[in-house]
């Protein structure tokens, strides 16, 4: 077992497998703590097949009654902005609510307790501030003025370049595991520690690990062209928004790419290497039905772009950060569950402290429970931007 008391570790070599947001930030933090680090990915950082391969991701402090993730979100956002301030687009996030006992109300209480900015807006105020929005069916909304969107693919690529500039080694290679042996492109890995951070490829890579319960459902993201001559759906004019109970979310047009939205419920289970990444007519029409009700000026706009990616869902939507149960000095990091991207820097910082045995540093970021452990989990969709609804609420 690798246990090192010193805070700088030039003698330690760590191999991180997977250059998505968790793996790249873990590699960067290991390097910043002095380790020699090799970051391996079969397609390379920022590739379009990764769960972090789309253009943007929501960053928000609201996580219902949970107060650990809000702290991680703020801690991570500071690091994203330090890496490159243009990675954060401060749109604010608007949470639509139709009841007083839901995710939004729990989030408001938590944000108040943590001293994080939030506003309660009634339906009339929503329509006054953003006339593009029809609050039909909503009685109020929670608004996070300090939240917004992160540039996803560009963020991972930028973090990987920073890691390389800091002396890290980035390699393209196919990792495989056979018992206790790890190979990359056929060559055996020799390292003091290995971190498996392969996102939706974890079930393929480590399928024999007990309690590694990660499903890989398809997720479709639709970009609608904004109306000609109308900038009301651009970032700065309308916030990022979430309908938790309705299982929809959206991000305003950034870089003129279109008004992004997604029916946020799991699609079919897919192989991330083999799935055909084409939008389905069904989900596009579901999305149009939602637009017709709540963003009527967008309802008949054409699809400008589409992304088909995948989630890596754990049953309870909490991440997995734990030791490999049988492989010495190996760690499993994954299960982003549709809300992991924003937390990438905090995950990397926390994992690097665990791997290098810096218990004091790890304790400052540790959750108050065993949520990240390899363990049986009870099904819940709680931490994603989708509630319990199995399909979207749409009145076409």
Which stretches of residues belong to each language-model region?
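N-terminal Rossmann-like FAD-binding beta1-loop-alpha1 element of flavoenzymes
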Residues: 14-38
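Short hydrophobic core segments
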Residues: 17, 189-200
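Active-site substrate-recognition segment that forms the wall
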Residues: 28-32, 87-89, 200-326, 394
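Glycine-rich FAD pyrophosphate-binding loop
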Residues: 32-51
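Dinucleotide-binding Rossmann-like beta1-alpha1 core, especially the glycine-rich loop
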Residues: 55-129, 139, 247
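Short beta-strand to alpha-helix junction loop
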Residues: 96-103, 143-161, 278-282
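Helical element adjacent to the flavin cofactor pocket in flavoenzyme catalytic cores
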Residues: 145-179, 192
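C-terminal catalytic lobe of FAD-dependent flavoproteins
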Residues: 296-396
